[in-house]
Amino acid sequence: MTSSQPYTLTQLGWKPFFQQQLTLEDYENTQICRIVAHHRSGYQLCSEQGRFHLAIHHAQPKMTVGDWVLLDEQQQFKRLLERQSELSRKAAGSKIAEQLIATNVDTLFIVCSLNDDFNLSRIERYLSIAKEAHIEPVVVLTKADLSPQAEQNITQVQQLSATLWVEAVNALDPVSVAALQPWCAKGRTVAFIGSSGVGKSTLTNTLLGEETQQTGGIREDDSKGRHTTTARSVHMIPDGALIIDTPGMRELQLADCSEGVSETFAEIETLAQHCRFKDCQHQQEPGCAVQQAIDNGTLEARRLQNYFKLLREQAYNASTFAEQRNRIKQIGKMYRHVQSDKQKLKTTY
């Protein structure tokens, strides 16, 4: 969002879902803003009144690009509006924390290049996150000219789900990228997600019609991309949609994502209902409908193994998040107890 001119709420993606959360007092005494950039120093906000910078404060809730917030008359944070959707992952590394990627997104463009980066299991991981957030996923395949197996790879992605939208585009060609326009109508918010170097920033620039995002090349030795986007930000394209370009992710672990995994691998869970034993582990048990599907070629063994992997990952991370929340809750109780004892001592004296 590089223009200094104010935007209407409709242009910023305002919907009845958010309007229903406001009171008459909110309309009269607050400014409705959307977070369009998130930096270490704070948030960049856009509203009908213009642009604002909001410093990060420990008393604020965790926020990110896409959030709607209310500011008071002094342009200080007042309230975060409930989110319509929330993209998140487990924070990278050993840290036990959930990291917000973007919020209030209508469509998630899962970008994957058809070179050595192509990985069906990674696409399934992204699909699980999108479905958990109730966001429409669209798989965007780039760099088909670099792969002799492009057509085969495109078919493999299409076979992941009969209802999955898959578009193969040349990220540098506006005519080719026009295939994404049905999801880029005025007031809609779309986000790009994918590994470094797959073409997210190039796609953003092509949709914008200008070189707004820096782009980087691919290392020839391993086809790995270089980080070019280092912070999440919102851009408005000529068609009126808002685009969130996210940094490339070398690590994407699931947080609490059981519903998303179930939806992504729905056919496996349907098959499991026909196993002879209710507690079937889908390994070597007799009468296993899942293993039978693998034997007759209607289910990939790779897909089943990835299903198991994502189930284990999300179950472990969900339990660690729950333990952390319980610890924080206990610390809060202890703090309130100590404060209560201090107050009693004061009244005694």
UniProtKB/Swiss-Prot annotation:
PROSITE patterns: ENGC_GTPASE, G_CP
Domain called CP-type G: residue spans: 97-252
Swiss-Prot/TrEMBL keywords: Cytoplasm, GTP-binding, Hydrolase, Metal-binding, Nucleotide-binding, Ribosome biogenesis, RNA-binding, rRNA-binding, Zinc
A GO cellular-component term linked to this record: cytoplasm
Chain sites annotated for binding GTP: T142, K143, A144, D145, G194, S195, S196, G197, V198, G199, K200, S201, T202
E.C. number: 3.6.1.-
GO molecular function terms noted in the UniProt entry: GTP binding; GTPase activity; metal ion binding; rRNA binding
Pfam families: RsgA_GTPase
Gene3D superfamilies according to UniProt: P-loop containing nucleotide triphosphate hydrolases, Probable gtpase engc, domain 3
Enzyme superclass (EC): hydrolase
Cofactor note: Binds 1 zinc ion per subunit.
Protein localization: Cytoplasm
GO biological process assignments: ribosomal small subunit biogenesis
InterPro entries the UniProt entry points to: G_CP_dom, P-loop_NTPase, Ribosome_biogen_GTPase_RsgA, RsgA_GTPase_dom
Main subcellular localisation: cytoplasm
Binding site for Zn(2+): C275, C280, H282, C288
Domain of life: Bacteria
Family statement drawn from the similarity comment of this UniProt entry: Belongs to the TRAFAC class YlqF/YawG GTPase family. RsgA subfamily.
Function, as annotated: One of several proteins that assist in the late maturation steps of the functional core of the 30S ribosomal subunit. Helps release RbfA from mature subunits. May play a role in the assembly of ribosomal proteins into the subunit. Circularly permuted GTPase that catalyzes slow GTP hydrolysis, GTPase activity is stimulated by the 30S ribosomal subunit.
Quaternary structure note: Monomer. Associates with 30S ribosomal subunit, binds 16S rRNA.
Name listed for the protein in its UniProt record: Small ribosomal subunit biogenesis GTPase RsgA 2
Organism encoding this protein: Vibrio vulnificus (strain CMCP6)
Gene: rsgA2
